[in-house]
């Protein structure tokens, strides 16, 4: 069974979390993970002005997701950077193209989850995840979060992302902070959890 991990990453933070989610999926026997990016909407000029050209080159080996892959997957986990407390425009545009899938109920009953990154500790992690989950519910998906059985989200000894709605990371205002090991552990846990739930549902 396949868990599709669909994400957008400009500087690599969400990509690192996506890779950790995939690692968690692979810990469950019989489960595989497929990494896909949503199509870019920014021009190369804009990406260059944002200082993201090298990061984008490093991520270019990951294929763009097709709408058909959404329906073929047994479960889907979405990852996005936060833009003013919501998912990024690239992800929104991709999901806004799923109207035909919605009409035929192509995602109904599939487990789904979300993870994200923000610049700051209180930069909209939970609002991004909660607003994203609304789209999953409209598609009839079964939302799988990050339960408190992952004890790392209770830590107070370091600045860390994570909430029951999904794994998160804090990038810093200048993007210099990459996901911590605790945040990557959260992503692995979420991947393993959604893979296990998917396997049980399909059994």
Swiss-Prot record:
The keyword NADP applies. Substrate binds at residue 102. NAD(+) binds at residue 11. It comes from Solidesulfovibrio magneticus (strain ATCC 700980 / DSM 13731 / RS-1) (Desulfovibrio magneticus). PANTHER family: FLAVODOXIN-RELATED PROTEIN WRBA-RELATED, FLAVOPROTEIN-LIKE PROTEIN YCP4-RELATED. It is an enzyme of class 1 (oxidoreductase). The keyword Transcription regulation does not apply. SUPFAM superfamilies: Flavoproteins. It comes from the Bacteria. This is NAD(P)H dehydrogenase (quinone). Keywords: Flavoprotein, FMN, NAD, NADP, Nucleotide-binding, Oxidoreductase. The lineage of its organism: Bacteria, Pseudomonadati, Thermodesulfobacteriota, Desulfovibrionia, Desulfovibrionales.
């Amino acid at each position: 069974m396949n868990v599709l991990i669909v994400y957008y990453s400009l500087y690599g933070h969400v990509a690192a979390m996506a890779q950790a989610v995939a690692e968690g999926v692979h810990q469950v026997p019989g489960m595989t993970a497929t990494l896909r990016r949503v199509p870019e909407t920014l021009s190369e000029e804009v990406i260059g002005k944002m200082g993201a050209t090298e990061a984008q080159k490093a991520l270019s080996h990951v294929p763009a997701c097709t709408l058909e892959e959404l329906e073929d997957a047994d479960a889907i986990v979405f990852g996005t950077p936060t833009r003013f407390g919501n998912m990024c425009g690239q992800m929104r545009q991709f999901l806004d193209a799923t109207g035909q899938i919605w009409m035929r109920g192509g995602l109904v009953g599939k487990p789904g989850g979300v993870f994200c990154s923000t610049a700051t500790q209180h930069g909209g992690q939970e609002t991004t995840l909660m607003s994203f989950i609304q789209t999953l519910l409209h598609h009839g998906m079964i939302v799988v979060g990050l339960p408190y059985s992952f004890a790392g989200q209770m830590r107070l000894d370091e600045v860390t992302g994570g909430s029951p709605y999904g794994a998160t990371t804090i990038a810093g205002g200048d993007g210099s902070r990459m996901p911590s090991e605790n945040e990557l552990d959260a992503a692995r846990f979420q991947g393993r959890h959604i893979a296990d739930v998917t396997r049980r549902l399909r059994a």
